[in-house]
Amino acid sequence: MKTKIFKVKDIFTIVNPKGHLNTKQLIPGDDLPYVAAKKTNNGVAKMCSKDNIPTTDIMDGNAIVFIQQGDGSAGYTTYQPKPFYAISCVTCGYSPRLNDKRGLYLVSILDKNKVFYSHARSWNRQLIQETELPLPVSTVPSPDYALIDSMIIGGGYRNE
């Protein structure tokens, strides 16, 4: 399998969450996941109601969430398939080529960057954009998304 190094900024549009409500201000409910700086539970700190969240603060799903800081979670990523609420401890990456299979694959690659970040060094927007991703390529110099999909569906890559 041939790979090429891409930077996050070449694959994703990076978006900062717009949310300003803290955990205590959120109304408990089942409408939206509140995605925070944690790796466990796919980054979901709690479920909340949409009742006091402006619609402009709700992030679209089908996103890679980059955890910038947190209790040992800085440098991790999660894939969020559905709309969610988040605040400034994370940054979101969007791509029209992203789907659930590619999201899982990219999270597994991106999480290898965890070793570079901690309480002393957060994964800020600039560092996120410059983060390198080794991705499979075919004859054209862009990621081979069909191969990524088949690896996730088929459970791996076999060079026969």
Task: Walk through the language-model features, giving the residues of each.
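Non-catalytic DNA-recognition/assembly elements of restriction-modification systems
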Residues: 1-42, 138-160
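Sequence-level motif detector for i,i+2 pairs with an aromatic at +2
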Residues: 3, 29-32, 61, 82, ...
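A structural detector for beta-sheet-dominated domains
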Residues: 9, 67, 134-136
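A short beta-sheet element
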Residues: 47-109
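Short, intrinsically disordered, mixed-charge
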Residues: 53, 108-115, 150-153
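Glycine-anchored helix-breaking recognition loops at helix->coil/strand junctions
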Residues: 89, 107-138
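A generic structural motif
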Residues: 95-98, 135-139
